[in-house]
Amino acid sequence: MSEAGGAGPGGCGAGAGAGAGPGALPPQPAALPPAPPQGSPCAAAAGGSGACGPATAVAAAGTAEGPGGGGSARIAVKKAQLRSAPRAKKLEKLGVYSACKAEESCKCNGWKNPNPSPTPPRADLQQIIVSLTESCRSCSHALAAHVSHLENVSEEEMNRLLGIVLDVEYLFTCVHKEEDADTKQVYFYLFKLLRKSILQRGKPVVEGSLEKKPPFEKPSIEQGVNNFVQYKFSHLPAKERQTIVELAKMFLNRINYWHLEAPSQRRLRSPNDDISGYKENYTRWLCYCNVPQFCDSLPRYETTQVFGRTLLRSVFTVMRRQLLEQARQEKDKLPLEKRTLILTHFPKFLSMLEEEVYSQNSPIWDQDFLSASSRTSQLGIQTVINPPPVAGTISYNSTSSSLEQPNAGSSSPACKASSGLEANPGEKRKMTDSHVLEEAKKPRVMGDIPMELINEVMSTITDPAAMLGPETNFLSAHSARDEAARLEERRGVIEFHVVGNSLNQKPNKKILMWLVGLQNVFSHQLPRMPKEYITRLVFDPKHKTLALIKDGRVIGGICFRMFPSQGFTEIVFCAVTSNEQVKGYGTHLMNHLKEYHIKHDILNFLTYADEYAIGYFKKQGFSKEIKIPKTKYVGYIKDYEGATLMGCELNPRIPYTEFSVIIKKQKEIIKKLIERKQAQIRKVYPGLSCFKDGVRQIPIESIPGIRETGWKPSGKEKSKEPRDPDQLYSTLKSILQQVKSHQSAWPFMEPVKRTEAPGYYEVIRFPMDLKTMSERLKNRYYVSKKLFMADLQRVFTNCKEYNPPESEYYKCANILEKFFFSKIKEAGLIDK
């Protein structure tokens, strides 16, 4: 090794580019630092031929195995050994990375042992402690001159620096062994960053032109998957829902230990993809998620908590294919209960999730999904994943299947400090036991139903043993039209497939048989339609048909043509064979078609219905009032003489195939809540007799006992709600701006951070803050003053519910609340 500064980890200059971030990585050097000489600590750190960098610890990019599990274990052992060494040995180690301070003119930036150890190093020689008077082979000054700044450093700080030293040496090996240019460049940047932090005795912070800090996208992958479970499976019974939650945990766990392929490999596989965007995420992933698994002196983040939809889209297809292939290969190694979960349920789960990942209008990626579905999420849907400490080491059991969930290991002291899980004594927001005891005394927002009551009602209506009354083995007389069909689909009696003819590839025999079956069903059920016309459209490549299959044969279908550029789909034929009608198949068929179109971002149906079909289409939400402009569809759809044009607008937030189940459950909840309220009000009033005397209507407040139920009349406001939306918007904007500018508004400007307020989101079920209100106002969410006032009132109520009355936050809430009410009175929104 050259003895000039900048040759190796002991003498590599850390000044140039050390402060640059991963987005502005220093150019890859023409000649990387050469291999360390005999006796250099790098040789010992490499640990023989088994050492490798995080990205090179796997054979192929994209594997699901956590890279370098053995490497991280070796590093942990070496750190433990070094931290238990005598102080003199520690000083020798740190001296290698410390600039000489004997003279200002001395440029030596790392002490070099004049008597290097042999290669490979012998165990008996490793324990020899060098004297502080030993001269440096490079500058001839004593070791003490290199470590004079460490004389009064505590053992804890010295151990921290030694941990960084071993991480530097590990990254030095990575730089030399890595073949991919992009990955090598990131390793080199991190190597210099850690090297600089040793020289300056600071904490390494990744920074630079990638100004964005974690999280890089909201909502995160973890939140998106959690939203997906709530969106698609909240209606399921608790046992089935728990299965979905387990699948979600498994999926998130695999992403956290998934190894991303290098940008160069991705460029070869997908030349048309956005490589620059992927490279940016890959760099962030290396710096914040991958390398910190092994170099714990760097702050570590979970991939699923700091990345969002963009990264998930870039890896999902490959990841899904490899996970399922891996599951098939290792099915014999899996326990029986895991085998069913992974081989049967996991593929379906991934398919449904894939549709939401790539859909443009999927609600699971909306920022306000949680606030919009907060009540649904509380009905038994638990958080999909309980986040482990942000920094931690993961151990894999080599004897178990690689699809088993890894166990979270222990965090190092440095990691615990950065994880934010331990409350500091000086934290302002502190939850005390006395506060919990006083919870019942706190005011609550009007209309909120206690979660204990909701959970109790849910446990009653979902537990057959808790429901009173006779057992029934058949569908209720009031069950939804599609309930029988939905149950048959779950049992596998019926199936739904979108099929169509193709000019590009030869359809398989099964699809051709189904197309012929569809032609026959439409011909029999639509006798006034020419058979040749039906055949032409069914086999037209521009048309598709949602086929209903039972016992392997077609019993119904909906033929349609999509016009993506116009934003609508034309329904051409819709029929179910006569002997299979009145079973709910028609409704369930249409609901599947609606969900199919939501996934393809087409939210309008148009159809010409004859006199016999109008009733059916009305039941499916169609109307004679067409919502889309006439210019969009004139000249595109087929006009039928004597038929009525009908349209249907789809709501992308509604899971149509499960909609009736959700409505039914909501009705059951309301019914049970009413029954409980009735049980609390013991007084029975006689019925109203006024209607017998010809009275057509009476004021609600005149009904005997109505006030005892908790009903309150709405006060007659002198100044009515502004009818003009723009006028209301301007008024609310002015009020909100004045509230935000108030000197007591500072605690409420941003959403409460979990690290600042432990347990806040377990106490406060419906959080609100001024930033969220500003975004809602900007998006025209507040269509009435009541919505606006309810949100701002919730800000104050939440604060008072969480914080004790003597706290500064509580006092700020009282002051700001009075100010707010004075402003809405001035604006004439309430009576003065």
Curated annotation (Swiss-Prot):
(Microbial infection) The bromodomain mediates binding to HIV-1 Tat. Belongs to the acetyltransferase family. GCN5 subfamily. Activated in vitro by very low concentrations of spermidine, but inhibited at spermidine concentrations higher than 4 uM. The activating effect of low spermidine concentrations may be mediated by N(8)-acetylspermidine produced by KAT2B/P/CAF itself acting as a positive feedback loop. Residues 24-39 have a biased composition (Pro residues). One of its GO terms (biological process) is limb development. Pfam families: Acetyltransf_1 (PF00583), Bromodomain (PF00439), PCAF_N (PF06466). Residues 425-436, 714-725 have a biased composition (Basic and acidic residues). Residues 1-22 have a biased composition (Gly residues). CDD domains: Bromo_gcn5_like, NAT_SF. One of its GO terms (molecular function) is protein-lysine-acetyltransferase activity. InterPro entries: Acyl_CoA_acyltransferase, Bromodomain, Bromodomain-like_sf, Bromodomain_CS, GCN5, GCN5/PCAF, GNAT_dom, PCAF_N. This is Histone acetyltransferase KAT2B. Keywords: Activator, Acyltransferase, Biological rhythms, Bromodomain, Cell cycle, Cytoplasm, Cytoskeleton, Disease variant, Host-virus interaction, Nucleus, Transcription, Transcription regulation, Transferase. Residues 40-54 have a biased composition (Low complexity). Residues 1-54, 395-436, 706-725 are annotated as: Disordered. Changing Y760A: Reduced acetyl-lysine binding. Functions as a histone acetyltransferase (HAT) to promote transcriptional activation. Has significant histone acetyltransferase activity with core histones (H3 and H4), and also with nucleosome core particles. Has a a strong preference for acetylation of H3 at 'Lys-9' (H3K9ac). Also acetylates non-histone proteins, such as ACLY, MAPRE1/EB1, PLK4, RRP9/U3-55K and TBX5. Inhibits cell-cycle progression and counteracts the mitogenic activity of the adenoviral oncoprotein E1A. One of its GO terms (cellular component) is A band. It is found in: Nucleus; Cytoplasm, Cytoskeleton, Microtubule organizing center, Centrosome; Cytoplasm. Residues 395-413 have a biased composition (Polar residues). It is linked to Defects in KAT2B has been found in a patient with isolated coloboma, a defect of the eye characterized by the absence of ocular structures due to abnormal morphogenesis of the optic cup and stalk, and the fusion of the fetal fissure (optic fissure). Isolated colobomas may be associated with an abnormally small eye (microphthalmia) or small cornea.
